[in-house]
């Protein structure tokens, strides 16, 4: 989604 949290 932004970083490596939820794509």
Swiss-Prot record:
Expressed by the skin glands. GO terms for cellular component: extracellular region. The modification D-methionine is found at residue 2. One of its GO terms (biological process) is neuropeptide signaling pathway. One of its GO terms (molecular function) is opioid peptide activity. The keyword Secreted applies. Belongs to the frog skin active peptide (FSAP) family. Dermorphin subfamily. This is [D-Met2]-deltorphin. It comes from Phasmahyla jandaia. The lineage of its organism: Eukaryota, Metazoa, Chordata, Craniata, Vertebrata.
């Amino acid at each position: 989604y932004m970083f490596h949290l939820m794509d």
